[in-house]
C-alpha cells in the first residue's frame, strides 16, 4: 500500500513540475467612455474595454482576484474552460455561486488541464457581459513548436464586444439569434 501511495505522489509531482500559478487582479469599476459621440458610463475591468487578456500554459493553475467596485453584483465565467475538479469556479451566477456583491472580493481558482487555444472570459450576470470580457489564451505546454502552422510574426488577440446605449436596468433581452 505504501508503494502505491508513493507512486501516486511521485506521479502528481512529476505532472505538476512545469506548471505555474498565474495570478491576476480584476478591479471592476465604472468609467465614462465616449463612443459614437455619446458619453456612457460603462462597467469595466481594470479600466479597460475590453478587459485584460489572461495568458497561461496548459497545465497551469489560475487565480483571479475580483475586487468589485461597481454598483452591481457579478460573476466571471471562464467560457469553454474544462473545469474538472474546479466546477465551483465556473462563475455561473446563482448556479455555481452567488454574485460578488459591490465592495466585496472573491478569488477564482482553477486549473487549465487537457486543453489549449484561445477562449474568453466574461461577466455572467445580466448585461454586464457586454463590457466585462477578455481573452483567455491557453498555450500548449510544449511551446509553439507543437502548432500545425509556422510561428506567426506577431500575435494580437481580437475581442469583439457589444456597446449598449441604454441603462443596465432598461436593456431588453435579445429574443432570437445567437448571443453567447
Regions found by a protein language model. Give the residues of each.
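Histidine-centered copper-binding motifs that mark active-site loops
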Residues: 8-180
Amino acid at each position: 500500500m505504501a508503494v502505491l501511495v508513493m507512486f501516486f505522489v511521485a506521479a502528481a509531482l512529476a505532472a505538476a513540475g512545469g506548471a505555474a500559478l498565474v495570478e491576476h487582479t480584476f478591479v471592476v469599476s465604472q468609467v465614462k467612455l465616449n463612443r459614437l459621440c455619446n458619453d456612457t458610463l460603462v462597467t469595466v475591468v481594470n479600466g479597460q474595454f475590453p478587459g485584460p487578456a489572461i495568458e497561461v500554459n496548459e497545465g497551469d493553475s489560475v487565480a483571479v482576484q475580483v475586487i468589485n467596485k461597481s454598483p452591481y453584483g457579478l460573476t466571471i465565467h471562464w467560457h469553454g474552460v474544462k473545469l474538472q475538479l474546479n466546477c465551483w469556479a465556473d462563475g455561473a451566477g446563482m448556479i455555481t455561486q452567488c454574485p460578488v456583491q459591490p465592495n466585496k472580493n472573491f478569488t477564482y481558482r482553477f486549473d487549465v488541464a487537457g486543453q489549449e487555444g484561445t477562449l474568453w472570459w466574461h461577466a455572467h450576470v445580466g448585461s454586464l457581459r457586454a463590457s466585462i470580457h477578455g481573452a483567455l489564451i491557453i498555450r500548449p505546454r510544449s511551446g509553439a513548436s507543437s502548432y500545425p502552422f509556422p510561428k506567426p510574426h506577431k500575435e494580437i488577440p481580437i475581442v469583439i464586444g457589444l456597446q449598449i446605449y441604454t441603462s443596465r436596468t432598461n436593456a431588453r433581452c435579445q429574443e432570437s439569434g445567437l448571443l453567447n
